[in-house]
Amino acid sequence: MAGNSIGQLFKVTTFGESHGIALGCIVDGVPPNMELSEADLQPDLDRRKPGTSRYTTPRREDDEVQILSGVFEGKTTGTSIGLIIKNGDQRSKDYGDIMDKFRPGHADYTYQQKYGIRDYRGGGRSSARETAMRVAAGAIAKKYLKEQFGVEIRGYLSQIGSVKIDPQTVANIEQIDWQQVNSNPFFCPDPVAVEQFDELIRELKKEGNSIGAKLTVIAENVPVGLGEPVFDRLDADLAHALMSINAVKGVEIGDGFAAVEQKGSEHRDEMTPEGFCSNHSGGILGGISSGQPIIAHIALKPTSSITVPGKSVNVHNEPVEVVTKGRHDPCVGIRAVPIAEAMMAIVVLDHLLRFKAQCR
C-alpha cells in the first residue's frame, strides 16, 4: 500500500490501524537543535482525541505520544523523529456484524476490491484514528514555524449542517476571538452558534444520525515566495493535504467557489505602497505565497457510521441491511480543526524549507 507519506524536505510517513496495537509516524527533515518533548505535542493531540466531550465518539483514548528517536537531551538532532501512540480502548466485537458487509459510504468496498482483504475493525487503515499521528507531526511543524519564522496556524469551525456562524465574527482576522474558539468543544468563534450547534448535535444523537461541517484554517505571517510552480504550487499542495483528511469532500482557497459570482474588478487583490487592499486569493497568487494570511476552507461529509439502517451488499454481492454498532462521532468536523491545522503546517514548513534551499 503506497501513499502513506507527504512532503519532500519535511516528510511525514504514518502507519497503524484503528484497532491495531499502536499508531506511529516517522518525521524526516526536522532541523536540528530545536527544543522538543512530548509536552510540546500533547496539547494538539488532546484537542483531537476522542471522548473529550458529549459531542464526539465515546471511545476513550489517552493518545499519549512517545518520542522514540531524533531527540537527544531535549533537542532535535536532525535525524528522523519516530513517534508512537498506543491504542487502548478498542472494542472490535462491535464490528463482528459487518465482517462480511460493506458499510455504505465507507471505504470497506473499495479496500476489499483493491486489495482483496481489509481490516473491518473500525475501518482499519481508513479510519480517522490515523490522523492522530498527523496531528503529532503537525505539532512539530507548528512549533518550528512559530519559533523560527513567527508563522502561526489556527483554525475554527464555521458551519454544522445548515447552522452557520455570524460572518461578522470572522470578517477581520485580527478580530477573531481565538480565546472563544479554544474555550468550547466546537472550536467556534461565535458563542451564539455554539448554542445552536449544541442543540443540533443533541437531536442528531437521538436520531442516531450524523451531519456535515465546514471549517477554516489560517496561516499568518507566512513569508512571500513559498510554492513551486507549476505542479507544486502552494495552493495545489495545500488542497492535496487537506483533501487527504478523512471525510473531506471539498477545499477552497480564499474566496474559493464564491469567485464564480465575482467580477474581476472585485476579486483582484489591488495593491498600494502600503500593501494589499483585499485578500480574495487567500494569500496565494500564481501558486506562490503573497505574504498575506493563507486562508483555506474545507467541507466534511456526514459520517456514514450511523445507527439508521442502510441498504448495502456483502462480500458475495448479496443484499443486506447495515446498522453500525460501533462508537462514532455525530459530526466528524468537530474534531477536524487540529487535523486541518496540522496538514497546513506540514505543507507550509515543507515549502519553507524548499524555499530556503533554492532561493536564500
UniProtKB/Swiss-Prot annotation:
Cofactor(s) required, per the database record: FMNH2
Keywords from the named record: Amino-acid biosynthesis, Aromatic amino acid biosynthesis, FAD, Flavoprotein, FMN, Lyase, NADP
PROSITE patterns for this protein: CHORISMATE_SYNTHASE_1, CHORISMATE_SYNTHASE_2, CHORISMATE_SYNTHASE_3
Gene Ontology molecular functions: chorismate synthase activity; FMN binding
Entry annotated with the keyword Electron transport: no
Binding site residues for NADP(+): 48, 54
GO CC annotation terms, alphabetical: cytosol
GO biological process: amino acid biosynthetic process; aromatic amino acid family biosynthetic process; chorismate biosynthetic process
Assembly and oligomerization: Homotetramer.
Protein name: Chorismate synthase
Organismal lineage: Bacteria, Pseudomonadati, Pseudomonadota, Gammaproteobacteria, Pasteurellales
Gene name as annotated: aroC
